[in-house]
Amino acid sequence: MIKITFPDNSVREYAKGTTAMQIAESISSRLAQEVLAASVNGEVWDLSRPINDDATVKLLKWEDEEGKHAFWHSSAHLMAEALQELYPGIKFGIGPAIENGFYYDVDPGEAVIKEGDFAAIEAKMLELVAKKEEIKRQDITKADAMKMFGDRGEEYKTELISELEDGTITTYTQGSFTDLCRGPHLPNTSYLKAVKILSVAGAYWRGDEKRKQLVRLYGITFPKKKMLDEYLTLLEEAKKRDHRKIGKEMDLFMFSDTVGKGLPMWLPKGTALRLRLQEFLRRIQARYNYQEVMCPPIGNKLLYITSGHYAKYGKDSFQPIHTPEEGEEYFLKPMNCPHHCMIYKNSPRSYKDLPLRLAEFGTVCRYEQSGELHGLTRVRSFTQDDAHIFCRPDQVKQEFLNVMDIISIVFKTMNFENFEAQISLRDKVNREKYIGSDENWEKAEQAIVEACEEKGLKAKIEYGEAAFYGPKLDFMVKDAIGRRWQLGTIQVDYNLPERFQLEYTGADNQKHRPVMIHRAPFGSMERFVAVLIEHTAGKFPLWLTPEQVCIMPISEKFNDYAWQIARELGNQEIRAIVDDRNEKIGRKIRDNELKRIPYMLIVGEKEAENSEVSVRKQGEGDKGSMKIATFAALLNGEVEEMMNRWQKSND
């Protein structure tokens, strides 16, 4: 008999070789219908795989991320099987599950797969679902795998196999389709009741622009059709909120192929928005004694060799800048941290000087393949709201608490009320790859866990997910339509202090290494603005929006009165513009609603005679007529209320 421990710490005994499906059936028939895969000692398994030793088991359902992953991984195989039947001779690359659905990279040869073919592919997938094909795992030798896929002319698969270590290789088979795969997978195809092919795109094999461009098909599946319908409705809403579309409508930013792909340019309104965000963060950081610094946009190659960034980014970075006189090489800055390490090193440091908190809105450049570029969320030049804290090991917990406060203030002020966190710690067993002493790691890991507990923050702990140089805490927010975005990171670093030989003199008069903490509440200004646009659909908080008021005269003869109002509001620090185009008032209202301006003031003969304005509020319509001073007090009162909420959350 073997002992199975469940997440609630209850224990049951089963015969050796019992499968996770049999365990589910022993608990309830409903659970057996809902379970998709199982976590066995932290590793996700197929439900049919025998468990031969005592184990900790969690039965995974749709609600679990690992359950969805297995579901969508099996869906990728289902789509591949359908493609194999529809396009004889098609060759397969890779087909992983992703955050929302799955994709498969395929080489259809002379055939062309286009959007008009999606319905036929979906129909074939549902035909295979109805067959309830069993998904079978098989362990074979590397030689057998090479022969199997080689005989089929699967050149992409044989390339992958050739790079694997000698030993057992896993394949999965359903119907006539067999794939090289680690798994896990569902028991059979009948689980995949609702299918949808979403899009088709090009993708270079293994992300290498010098290799062949394959066809990438994206899809998504659900256990129920109702869930698919809800998702497709969500997709339509997401299209309306696309930051690229709204950013263009609101004149926030632009791109130009003449300037260069992936290089955003901020227009006046977008710049005003961005600067206001930066000032907001500066005000918060000032309370926590951050000192702002400014560093050059390039650095000597030797700096990045020392930091290790040259090894990571050098090969794929932009071309170096050569100085003919000195014969030196300079690179566009990929990270701010090496420069901050040199600032720390500029002066002798005592334990009394720590923590030292250096902040910078630093622009960095990293090469991204053109196919990976996407609006503001994936660019080649971006500005990080970066800060690096140099502290003693005993100060790590308090610094985490402080940064968590800052991130919480940012999220609440921007109305990201729904967020979660993940703690990434060392692997429980394999610890050779981590730099730094066990003692310091244990202190840092304990400090992060305790900080989350003190703040009442429910954080998921992931062992083995820490970087080799330190544990970290990541924050994920849910936007207004339920999508998850990773925003805000706090990362402990034992690597750079070692590489740069950073020191401080301790109370014992001996030299010690400081702990370095990286943090960025926004992540990058570009990505944060993109997420904020899609979260708010461009309807920013009143204090933040670039233009708070648009004054619209109903005819040219009231233009002077409109500009007089704009000046009066400007004197009270209200951001107002005048739309004095020779257009009908209905057209002006529609155009400015598209620009998401919170308030519109309509002025005509009646308003001019009474020194009033007719007020319309975005999303609420007509608010009636009022004196200019009354309106100004109303607007400033709204802003003050928002700022008071921020102030309370900061106290």
UniProtKB/Swiss-Prot annotation:
Catalyzed reactions: tRNA(Thr) + L-threonine + ATP = L-threonyl-tRNA(Thr) + AMP + diphosphate + H(+)
Signal peptide from the UniProt entry: none
MF (Gene Ontology): ATP binding; metal ion binding; threonine-tRNA ligase activity; tRNA binding
Classification via PROSITE patterns: AA_TRNA_LIGASE_II, TGS
Gene Ontology terms: cellular component: cytoplasm
Region annotated Catalytic, chain positions: 242-541
Protein name, UniProt field: Threonine--tRNA ligase
Organism, scientific name: Parabacteroides distasonis (strain ATCC 8503 / DSM 20701 / CIP 104284 / JCM 5825 / NCTC 11152)
Gene that encodes it: thrS
